[in-house]
Every structure is written in structure tokens, then in C-alpha cells.
Amino acid sequence: VAEIMGKEMMDAAGLTTLEAMRAATPEQLDAAFGAFMATGKVQGLPLVPHIDGRLLGKSFTEAATDNTIADVPYMLGSTLDDMMPTMGEGIDAFAALRETQTKNPVYAYRFDRRLPGEPNTAYHSSELWFMFKTLKNSRRPFTAADYELADRMMDYWTNFAKFGNPNGNNVDGEWKPDTKENPFTMHLDIK
């Protein structure tokens, strides 16, 4: 289905050869995607992993339900103005499921900082500037508080990579695991 949809989208944009697709500008590809989405042929999220039976045998949801995903701590999150406003509900459901399967925790976050400048939103992936401390590479007028948030987030992600806990060795830190009995989402924003 993904290949058929991709071909249909490229054909409609006049990009019928591999050479034409490679030569297309990002703006042309974005316009082709927008025009294809406007046809209403796609329901739900169009940019999801393609389950082809070779590289990916099942969806993440199926693998989680079957308990065939890695038995490790997980950190999952979204942004305040994400394209899927119900993302948090899915994260809570995943955390509740994992709680029945393993003792490893799930940590949930929501990035709430609406970026300065235009667009003034916490759009999908806007937390990446902070996670990787690349604020200085952006055209946006970030403040000292933004740099403090980036430092805090870098500490959380580094601790999670090292210890499986964003609080590091302090297992009783401020970022609690997301559980069925005690749902918890760390809201990341400037103070």
C-alpha cells in the first residue's frame, strides 16, 4: 500500500522517474505531499512504519501486546501542539501494558515550551533543539531560560541512557515512572 500511495503521489506531481524525484526540491515534495493529503485518500497518520513482512514483521503495537519488544526501560513523549493530540493517552496505555509485563519502568514526557518566534508553537519535534542542545544553531530568539531547559533536558536524556532513569542514580527524583495507579507525565517548559 505504501508503495502504491507513493507512486500515486509522485505521478500526480509529475515526478514519474527516479531522476525527477531525486532532482525535486524540498518545496516540490512538500507541495506533492500536501496535494496528496488533500485528496482525502489517506486516513490517520500517513507517515508510519511500513510493515512489509521482511524488515518489519509487525507493528509496534502488535509487538508490545505480544511482549516481543526489548525488556528495557522506555522514555516516550510528545509535544504540546503535536499533530496527534491524543498521543499522551497512547503513552499511558503503553505504560500500563508494560507494567503487566515487566518491572522496567516507562517514563513519559510532554514538551510544553512554545518556541519564541514564528510559528510560536510546541510543534512535533520542537524538543529536539533542546535535547541535543543545538539552540545556538537556530534562527529563533531563545532566552537564558531556554538554555537552562536545554541543560536540564540533556541531563535527563543522558541519565536515561546511562541508568535507565532520567533522574540518574537518584531513583526517587522528580521524574516519576508512568504507571496505571500513578500516571505521571513530566512537563518540560521554561520556568
Language model feature labels by segment:
Residues 1-15, 23-24, 28-35, 62-191:
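C-terminal helix-and-tail extensions that cap enzymatic domains
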Residues 38-63:
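Mobile cap/lid helix-loop segments that gate and shape the active-site cleft of serine hydrolases
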